[in-house]
Amino acid sequence: FKYTFRNFTARKLTAIITVSGIAMVVFVFAAALMMAYGVEKTLVSTGSADNIKVLRKSSQGEISSIIDGDTENIIRALPHIAKGSDGNLMISAEPVVVINLEIKGGGLSNVTVRGVSQTVYQLRSQIKLIEGRLFNPSLRELIVGKSINNKFEGAQIGSKVKFAGDQWEIVGLFEAEGSGFESEMWGDAQQLLSAFNRESSVSTLTLKLDDMGNYEDFKRSFETDKRLLPFETKTEQKYFEEQSEYLAGFIRVLGIFITIIFSFGATIGAMITMYSAVANRTVEIGTMRSLGFSRRSILSAFLFEALLTSVVGGVIGLFIASFLQFFTISTLNWNSFSELAFSFSLSP
């Protein structure tokens, strides 16, 4: 083993090149997995296991789901829906639309605008207003998520955003513990319905039960009502987990594909390096044989050298990749066709 360690110091350039190639492969693979896990973590953390989501069965997401006012009233009459401190049912009827905003530095991208009621702050406790104030339900006002505020022009407090033929003033900035809500704008649901001439048709209903132990009873009442056959209910966490599957899966497959390509190059490079290392050390090998070292011992030394090179390269690649956790990037959410900001994240 001393022989192996001395070879590292004696042939520094060869060792550095080999270790760098392996480190690059590990870095790319780790970065792809961190990106996929970051998307999953962001979307899954968006939903709460204590909240129930109601959507139209044929919809691929909130944007394509429609729930009319009559259906909402039927759902409000179902058992086990919790009441807030004000005595009102804890249901948030939410229209969800997509608008275009200008990105800082040029270009346009889609942004989700969600209409909510005052009940939503009891349903989603992770929402924290960090600057400004909440929107006035009687005015065309918005609060924006932290990620939107950082990336888009005119998404700062005091700015006005034009859509649906009107000007909407931004009055507050919120964060949501790194969840997907930070990539949205929120305004009053009735104001949004009025602006888009949707009468009482919302995209989704989010509600809380008096006890999650009653979920099966609630679901049974929901599914046995023939008027609700076109709709489905699931926990909010499960909904967002399903939303993350396609995007995270695509990123993971793409990352593995790129890693395989890099791996071929790194493997060939490592093989050439080890072959040349053996070829250049024929005299040393002969000397060791004459000193009484067996072929097995010499082979073990070279195998240990290759293994050590790979381990060092892997550790360095993973160490460098770990710094990606300090970066936040954004991509297109395939289900909502809007911006989704997320951070690279190492899985447990």
Please tell me what each predicted stretch does:
Residues 39, 211-268, 277-279, 287-288, ...:
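Peri-transmembrane interface segments
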Residues 52-56, 149, 173-176, 199-225, ...:
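A short beta-strand structural signal in non-transmembrane regions
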Residues 275, 283-329:
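Transmembrane alpha-helical interface segments in multi-pass membrane proteins
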Residues 1-9:
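A short amphipathic helical element positioned immediately N-terminal to and/or at the very start
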Residues 92-97, 107-119, 125-191, 198:
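Hydrophobic secondary-structure segments that place a key small or acidic residue at a functional site
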